[in-house]
Amino acid sequence: MKKFLAALGLVVGLACSASFAQISVSRHNFSSYGWSGGEICKPCHTPHFAHPENGALWNHAMSSASYTLFDGSTGSSTDFDTRSRLCLGCHDGTVALDSFGGTTGINFIGPAGNLGVDFTNDHPVGKTGVYPTSGTSS
């Protein structure tokens, strides 16, 4: 049993370090910005002030914007899934990057990462089929 627990701890540790390594070299590593408090995960994830209905111990403020989406031959739609809304909490330009942990921030995403709220000329985003679950196809 001790060997199993040690092996399990090693696997979990390696998985966590791999996730940390991926974000530490990405544009989502905000640890060098003063508003992040030097934290790499806290602007998005934390057990305190988390919004459990959004999953992943989500800590960042959610956008309340209305989106216009491409919906193929039927025109546009306003149906948008939660996972896409998590990303757009920063990337639609309506919520500050430093709006997390129950605070309201003042630092907004720059033009290169700001996707706005009009997706009528984009590929389908924000739909369940974009993120298929096991047993489904897209």
Where are these regions (language model features)?
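Positively charged n-region of N-terminal signal peptides that target proteins for export
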Residues: 1-4
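C-type cytochrome heme-c attachment and multiheme electron-transfer modules
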Residues: 7, 11, 17-42, 46-138
